Amino acid sequence: DKNPNKYKEYLENYFKDLNLNKNNFFTDISNYLSYETGQPTHCYDSTKVNGNLVFNELDTNEEFETLLDKKINLTEKNSVFLLNNEVINLAGVVGGKNTSCSSKTMSVLVECAFFKPEAIMGKSLKYDIQSEASHKFERYVDPNCHDMVIRRFIKIVSDHTNIKNISVCSHVFEQNEIHEIPVNVDKINKILGTNINKDQYSNYLTKLGFDISKDQISIPTF
């Protein structure tokens, strides 16, 4: 049970700088990661996820209570997560109240996914939901960043508490192609009027997410 008032300095600065309210431990980390990486995540209290969790795109006609305590009527084709055939998450927009995290949540299921913009477009407007996740998914999120985001989530949690058990399930359907370009450090120095050696150049670009292989660099998809 984490006290949402006690975080590391970088998290505290995030809430202070953006003038945001704290919710609970896992939700706060999820919100921070969306800000830091641009990739929304969603946290389920795993003790409330009992049964078959399935993602589907289907015509729905049912009432859905969001984690914002708002009931909406799903009346058209939606991308949803179902638990035992009941909608628990309007994918890419908002999660459901029945599986949401609280200050008492000790075990969490983290969803880090890619949704095509056309599948999310207009949903928050139709259902009158102010959603940071839908705002990002509508504008495209890099499908290659999931591993990095999950590792970062784990790191932030471990900065604040001990982790007992971790398991990762991954399904890759779509990724952006990684492009490589040739780089000549001497030519870069000549053009820029700099004096950067190859070790410095490699160090700088690696920190920015580039992969270096001799005189080739791989451009990060983000």
Regions found by a protein language model. Give the residues of each.
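RNA/tRNA-interacting regions in translation and RNA-turnover enzymes
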Residues: 1-222
